[in-house]
Amino acid sequence: MIGKVAGILDFRGPDHVLIDVRGVGYIVYVSDRTLASMPGLGEAVALYTELVVREDLLQLFGFPTMIEKEWHRLLMTVQGVGAKAGMAILGALGAEGTARAITLGDARSIQAAPGIGPKIAQRVVLELKSKAPALMAMGGGTAALAPSEPPEPQPGTSSGSRRKTRAPEPPRPSHTADALSALANLGYQPTDAAQAVAQAAGESPDADTAALIRAALKLLAPKS
């Protein structure tokens, strides 16, 4: 199983990239969102990967974070959602947006992904709603992979033929998982907590952990 590919970005296609790992090129299919975030050609890149095996085809699908990879695997458990459909959903919504849509039962947002019809979107929401809290709580493992050091130049090539790698930006911390953990410690059921946190995060995307907890508690408070 190939779980991670790190090397030099050698080619960028409409739905895939070619990553050179010490002279071996790996074709990795990525979502539109991930493709847009790729560095320039000749720069270091690293992706978590999932190997999808068919009778006559092996394909690698790449993800910037482990949580996005896990969402892709979960999406493919839904009948009618294949690897490319899962990538379309993640490309349209991202991992957090997918989690929020499923938790809130928002099939229309799922349907906004290319190639996803209303029946499939509704099935995704119904089948995965109870499983969303567990993945949302994986926030500690959502950090994006930092590009590895570039491989040593191959014989016959100069080090100047590769661009210098840029220092990776520090990943934005996930406050969702911390808020979910706090609500769980307060005794709230995972599904209820996930729905409240998802709604709060959707209304205030830049909220920190404390703000998410306060907003979620207001949503969970008994209505008079």
From Swiss-Prot:
- At the top level of its lineage, which domain of life is listed? Bacteria
* Region of interest called Disordered, as start-end residue ranges on this chain: 141-185
Spell out the Gene3D superfamilies in the cross-references: 5' to 3' exonuclease, C-terminal subdomain, DNA helicase RuvA subunit, C-terminal domain, Nucleic acid-binding proteins
Q: Where is this region: Domain II?
A: 65-143
Q: Which UniProt keywords apply?
A: Cytoplasm, DNA damage, DNA recombination, DNA repair, DNA-binding
Give the residue ranges for region: Flexible linker: 144-170
- Which stretches of sequence are listed as region Domain I? 1-64
Has the keyword DNA-binding been applied to this entry? yes
Region Domain III: list its residue ranges: 171-224
Protein family: Belongs to the RuvA family.
Query: What is said about its interaction partners and assembly?
Result: Homotetramer. Forms an RuvA(8)-RuvB(12)-Holliday junction (HJ) complex. HJ DNA is sandwiched between 2 RuvA tetramers; dsDNA enters through RuvA and exits via RuvB. An RuvB hexamer assembles on each DNA strand where it exits the tetramer. Each RuvB hexamer is contacted by two RuvA subunits (via domain III) on 2 adjacent RuvB subunits; this complex drives branch migration. In the full resolvosome a probable DNA-RuvA(4)-RuvB(12)-RuvC(2) complex forms which resolves the HJ.
UniProt xrefs under NCBIfam families: ruvA (TIGR00084)
Q: What does this protein do?
A: The RuvA-RuvB-RuvC complex processes Holliday junction (HJ) DNA during genetic recombination and DNA repair, while the RuvA-RuvB complex plays an important role in the rescue of blocked DNA replication forks via replication fork reversal (RFR). RuvA specifically binds to HJ cruciform DNA, conferring on it an open structure. The RuvB hexamer acts as an ATP-dependent pump, pulling dsDNA into and through the RuvAB complex. HJ branch migration allows RuvC to scan DNA until it finds its consensus sequence, where it cleaves and resolves the cruciform DNA.
Listed name of the protein: Holliday junction branch migration complex subunit RuvA
Gene source species: Cereibacter sphaeroides (strain KD131 / KCTC 12085) (Rhodobacter sphaeroides)
